[in-house]
Amino acid sequence: MTDRKLALEAWESLFRAQHELFTEMVKDFDDAHLSQAEYDVLLTVTRSPSRTARLRDVTANMLISQPSVSRLVDRMVTRGLVAKCADPDDGRGALISATDAGTRAFRTLAMVHGRSIADRMSHLEDDELRALRDLAEKLRRG
């Protein structure tokens, strides 16, 4: 049986670490040409086959809360970061594709953001990083 006090301490520590890391990492976006939410959309889209994803998958994979992903995507279309078209397999759905400009903007910021993440995590050993990843996945699965 899980020790309730220990569970609460672990939860608080995890939440505080996430908050502090996020507060620090948000600085990566200060001079960027992408918002955090736009980066998040492009993260999902650029990792998808042919740099194309269903809008519902983009919404489900958002790491940052976004009340209206559809409106965000429409703004990104206007900026030339993504293209949006009807999903031929789902009449009500849409497909989102990263444009070359969107892919370039994403990769530029991803290099900066990736360095920040690597720097912040560098005080952990590889086995600790694997354990952290595995524990986080276990928590997500419930």
Task: Tell where the protein language model's regions lie, with residue ranges.
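N-terminal leader segment of winged-helix/HTH proteins
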Residues: 1-32, 79-81, 138
